[in-house]
Swiss-Prot record:
One of its GO terms (cellular component) is small ribosomal subunit. The keyword Electron transport does not apply. The keyword Ribonucleoprotein applies. The lineage of its organism: Bacteria, Pseudomonadati, Pseudomonadota, Alphaproteobacteria, Sphingomonadales. This is Small ribosomal subunit protein uS7. It comes from Rhizorhabdus wittichii (strain DSM 6014 / CCUG 31198 / JCM 15750 / NBRC 105917 / EY 4224 / RW1) (Sphingomonas wittichii). GO terms for biological process: translation. HAMAP family: Ribosomal_uS7_B. GO terms for molecular function: rRNA binding; structural constituent of ribosome; tRNA binding. InterPro entries: Ribosomal_uS7 (IPR000235), Ribosomal_uS7_bac/org-type (IPR005717), Ribosomal_uS7_CS (IPR020606), Ribosomal_uS7_dom (IPR023798), Ribosomal_uS7_dom_sf (IPR036823). Part of the 30S ribosomal subunit. Contacts proteins S9 and S11.
Amino acid sequence: MARRRRPEKREILPDPKFGDVVLSKFMNSVMLDGKKSVAEGIVYGALETIETRAKREPLGVFHEALNNVKPGIEVRSRRVGGATYQVPVEVRPDRSQALAIRWLISAARARSEHTMAGRLSGELLDAANNRGNAVKKREDTHRMAEANRAFSHYRW
């Protein structure tokens, strides 16, 4: 493993339709087996569905959903003596965004609608309204951190 320096972050180009870098990252996470055009079709289809169903600006709904799912705090395992403690730590903004994207996609994949675009649009609308499994996951994470607040002095 390299020890000298951190690798520089790769620049992610904004998506072609909306010109949004975060949406581009989201598409890359939706993508399976390198099929980017399929992922683009799914995400753009979901955003169109949001526009028709909710009569709201789809990019605004997307960012609202993402912000509602972003965790502010999480627990990490820390071994002290013979015991392992779940220590609450603050989440860096880039990790917070990555977790929110991951949770939104996994919650959408677990839904029962017929198409992935339909599942994704449903989950994004739910998350924008502070409902759905992705928001539940964030609340569970925060609850876990609150329950283990006594171990916060083990932070590193």
